[in-house]
Amino acid sequence: MNAPKQANISISTHFDSGAIEVVSLADPQDIQLNIRADQGVNGAAEFAQWFHFRLQGLAGVPLKLRFLNAAQCAYPKGWEGYRVVASYDRQLWFRIDTKFNTAFDASSDNKVMTATITPDTNSIYFAYFEPYSYERHLDLLGSAAESEHVQSEFLGHTIDGRDMNVLHITDASSNEANKKNIWLIARQHPGETMAEWFVEGFLERLLDVDDPVSRVLLAKCVFHVVPNMNPDGSIRGNLRTNAAGANLNREWQAPTMQRSPEVFLVRQNMLKTGVDLCLDAHGDEGLPYNFVAGSEGNPGYTAKIEALENAFKASWLATSPDFQTAHGYGKTAKGSANPTLATNWIAQQFNCLAFTIEMPFKDNANLPDAGVGWSGERSKKLGAGVLLPILSVANEL
């Protein structure tokens, strides 16, 4: 029997959120790659950090992936303590050994991130974080809409022609007066896929007919959920921008249909429904913790909002070991907030409680998992758990 021929070696990105630039595949111990900048209809944007690609043909061969431009990416500190995620079946994602020089020198052009693995099969995927596909996004919308408590509303189209939808969720049979309007938006920055995993966990629990927390909240509140604010950027394999090259979380003060239709359409719907609480789910490249950022820098920040913030955080601390308040962005002086950010604009416009929720690309340093780090499943658990702090403040909103 003849020995099988050596498989062809290739790297491909022609799939949802695929992104990498191949410099050299000549040596398995020196696979040279560049992390590709965000891409839009007008060419490259300023951000580069997301990658997602498939490598074929090297089963049983020790590999070293060298990301040559890691030090020139948008958040080079994000590589310190970071480990690449990999998968054979695109279902189970695990972390692999990764190194980056922690003595970072911005003036140097030779700081390279390296990742090593010996693949079990001839096909393996690598990514910055566990991907969340557009197909799964559509499945999430479809499964949620099957609930009697959910109405899916079409808001309009993105620049690439994709649908923007919001899920309106409440117990219509409840006779509760003056229901509170609670918004959850996610993935303004498309490479922050943990944000949509967070929403998936949130929706699964909110729509669980046997969950007492969900039943009470659906009687008291109307939820408005946008699982993916940036579907174009998601499919294009972008870290932070949409198809027009816009960073959506800098568009809230004056969005346009030409540059940021996603924000324009959602903001328009918020003005229609009102907002009593808004959560904006994100991922942070550098900090290995889950945390929130509030609106204390707004000129309209009040003692009531501060009290609500403290109650919300205290409840989350008491109910989730994955949440903490010791590490975060620090406080912004009152009157110095950036009004183009969603949390700041919403809190100021509606005089309400608003948080940016940040999850790590790395791991939760307070509760690490050596196998998967922070992951899609852990993001889902955190999303399900946020219902408790919402319940703790619902009567005071």
For the regions a protein language model found, what residue spans apply to each?
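Extreme N-terminal flexible tails
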Residues: 1-124
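A short, polar/proline- and glycine-enriched secondary-structure boundary/capping micro-motif
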Residues: 74-81, 136-139, 176-178
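Short helix/loop capping segments that flank catalytic or ligand/cofactor-binding pockets
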Residues: 75-76, 127, 134-137, 192-194, ...
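Extended acidic/polar, glycine-enriched regions
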Residues: 102, 106-160
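Well-ordered alpha-helical segments embedded in enzymatic catalytic cores
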Residues: 112, 262-265, 382-385
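Active-site/substrate-binding loop(s) of hydrolase catalytic cores
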Residues: 149-171, 176-338, 344, 355-358, ...
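Short, proline-enriched alpha-helix->beta-strand connector loops that line the catalytic pocket
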Residues: 350-353
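His/Asp/Glu-rich mid-to-C-terminal helical/loop segments that flank catalytic regions of hydrolases
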Residues: 366-397
